[in-house]
Amino acid sequence: MVVPEDHIRQVERLSQNLFVCPPHASQVTALAALDSNDELQANVDVYKKNREILLEELPKAGLKKFSPPDGAFYIYVDISDYSNDSLAFCKKVLNEANVAITPGIDFDQKRGNSTIRFSYARSTKDIIEGAKRIKDFMSKYY
């Protein structure tokens, strides 16, 4: 930043308050979030149930090649038996089954053409409905 010589100290003080640490309000909010154990556990329980549903239902749809998720709330699935164009596959699923999944090409430009990513960070009702739609889609087209 270029400022007049006599303003340097004031700009330094301002910069320190803006960039050295998160704003005070954000820090207080983060602390409150950390104290929300019941809500956090409820979300974790929903994600766990949703993960179990997809791990059971995806193979029934023919999507059997995946590593069990360990960490976030995503399942990466190998679709090389059906397509080597994950973007086109995801577009077709969206247009035909009204289910949004993410093409692997978004994460790996070299090997992502044959993978897709499912998120299970939705309501359990949505996951059950999405799994049904995926099964119907796969049985219709593959």
Show which residues each predicted segment covers.
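PLP-dependent class I/II
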Residues: 1-142
